[in-house]
Curated annotation (Swiss-Prot):
Protein's job: May have roles in neural function and cellular differentiation. Ectopic expression promotes axonal regeneration, induces differentiation of fibroblast into myofibroblast, induces myofibroblast ameboid migration, augments motility of gliomas, and increases retinoic-acid regulation of lipid-droplet biogenesis. Down-regulates the expression of TGFB1 and TGFB2 but not of TGFB3. May play a role in the regulation of alveolar generation.
Organism: Pongo abelii
Localisation: Cytoplasm
Post-translational modification: Phosphorylated on Ser-59. Phosphorylation decreases stability and activity.
Comp. bias regions, Polar residues: 44-54
Name this protein carries in UniProt: Neuronal regeneration-related protein
Disulfide bonds: none
GO cellular component: cytoplasm
């Protein structure tokens, strides 16, 4: 492992944001671009699709591999 002292990061124990930065950062959750939300929804929809030939009652598996 190579150590690069110029890449070291100081971690402060103070809560973030501190008093100096309070006016610069929005309160609450940061806004998320609509493109990210749309992509996340597409991934969720694709993950919820059941494969063809499978039953929802059992775990999805490859239906064309049969033991002989």
């Amino acid at each position: 492992m190579v150590y690069y002292p110029e890449l070291s990061v100081w971690v402060s124990q103070e809560p973030f944001p501190n008093k100096d930065m309070e006016g610069r950062l929005p309160k609450g959750r940061l806004p998320v671009p609509k493109e990210v939300n749309r992509k996340k929804n597409d991934e969720t929809n694709a993950a919820s699709l059941t494969p063809l030939g499978s039953s929802e009652l059992r775990s999805p598996r490859i239906s064309y591999l049969h033991s002989f």
